């Protein structure tokens, strides 16, 4: 990793696919373009996403996860033991290809290494983050038709994810984020769910981040310091920063990834609004341990709005950096 400024800015993972990529996917499904043409479109989209992140001033970018349709489906298609029967309705007219576990979970081959290697080759910084869905969330968002209980399923998934993470490190990944948005949704599972995440990162030599959002933080707060990760990033903006008091109460002592951008609202935050929110966060945590990020992935927004939100996030962060510099902090 290269040296980062105080209050590093990053993204959670996903970013809107360019319109032309969505059209290429449609044409491929219709049999009108080749597999090779589609892969070229995906690669071009990664370059476009990284260009957006660069232009916005993001310190730690991702490839936007543009090659992945969905955060669980992608991995279920590539890990042995899953089967798809068809889509299920999530809400309204939104459908999800919910996978079913029908046999023992086994790791087959690298799933993200090629994706990461290409992004690394075109990235403007070696501080490139790669994301992977965690074992608990994959299990929670799947049907279990094989294992006697969910815990056994989750721990077998943790072993598979651990192998993938180690392959990413071997390929040169330095910052790896485990996405666990479901981990804090069932109080009765949290203690062993945390153990499963630790199993997934066991023996890994990289900067490890975990992302959680939109659940009940009070379920997981007592266990956060037990996680064998360097940083945990949270959705804060949508909760008006109320979880900060909870984290302080439980003595949270890891790096804090602070969500300051609402990803479910098309309103573009101003840079001063972001700066004010960061000032709130610094009332609870020292700047040396704080990173700045959106609440969650940006893929559901238009590309234009997602980009403008990132610009506001970065500009607001710069305002606070300058204030800290005047107080004697080293910010570069």
Swiss-Prot record:
Example GO biological process: methylation
CDD domains: CIMS_C_terminal_like
Residues forming coiled coils: none
Pathway: Amino-acid biosynthesis; L-methionine biosynthesis via de novo pathway
Required cofactor names: Zn(2+)
One function term, GO molecular function aspect: 5-methyltetrahydropteroyltriglutamate-homocysteine S-methyltransferase activity
List of residues binding Zn(2+): 211, 213, 296
EC number: 2.1.1.-
Pfam families: Meth_synt_2
Record flagged with keyword Metal-binding: yes
Name by which UniProt lists this protein: Methionine synthase
Record-linked SUPFAM superfamilies: UROD/MetE-like
Cofactor note: Binds 1 zinc ion per subunit.
InterPro entries found in the cross-reference section: Met_Synth_C/arc (IPR002629), MetE_arc (IPR022921), UROD/MetE-like_sf (IPR038071)
């Amino acid at each position: 990793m290269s040296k980062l400024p105080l209050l590093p800015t990053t993204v959670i993972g996903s970013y809107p696919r360019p319109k032309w990529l969505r059209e290429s996917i449609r044409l491929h499904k219709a049999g009108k373009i080749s597999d090779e043409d589609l892969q070229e479109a995906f690669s071009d989209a990664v370059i476009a996403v990284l260009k957006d992140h660069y232009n916005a001033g993001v310190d730690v970018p991702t490839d936007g996860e543009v090659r992945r349709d969905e955060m669980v489906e992608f991995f279920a298609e590539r890990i042995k033991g899953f089967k798809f029967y068809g889509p299920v309705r999530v809400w309204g007219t939104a459908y999800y290809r919910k996978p079913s576990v029908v046999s023992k979970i086994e790791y087959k081959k690298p799933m993200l290494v090629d994706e990461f290697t290409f992004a690394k080759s075109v990235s403007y910084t070696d501080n490139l983050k790669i994301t992977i869905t965690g074992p608990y969330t994959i299990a929670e968002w799947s049907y279990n038709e094989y294992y006697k209980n969910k815990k056994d399923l989750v721990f077998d998934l943790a072993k598979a994810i651990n192998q993938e993470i180690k392959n990413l490190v071997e390929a040169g990944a330095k910052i790896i984020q485990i996405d666990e948005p479901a981990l804090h949704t069932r109080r009765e599972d949290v203690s062993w769910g945390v153990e499963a995440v630790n199993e997934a990162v066991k023996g890994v030599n990289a900067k490890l981040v975990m992302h959680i959002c939109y659940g009940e933080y009070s379920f997981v707060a007592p266990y956060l310091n037990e996680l064998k990760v360097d940083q945990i990033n949270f959705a804060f903006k949508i909760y008006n920063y109320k979880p900060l008091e909870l984290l302080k109460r439980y003595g949270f002592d890891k790096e804090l990834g602070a969500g300051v951008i609402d990803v479910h609202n098309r309103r573009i935050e101003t840079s001063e609004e972001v700066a004010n929110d960061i000032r709130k966060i610094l009332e609870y945590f020292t700047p040396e341990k704080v990173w700045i990020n959106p609440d969650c992935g940006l893929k559901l927004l238009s590309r234009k709005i997602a980009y403008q939100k990132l610009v506001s996030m970065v500009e607001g962060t710069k305002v606070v950096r300058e204030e800290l510099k005047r107080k004697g902090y080293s910010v570069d």
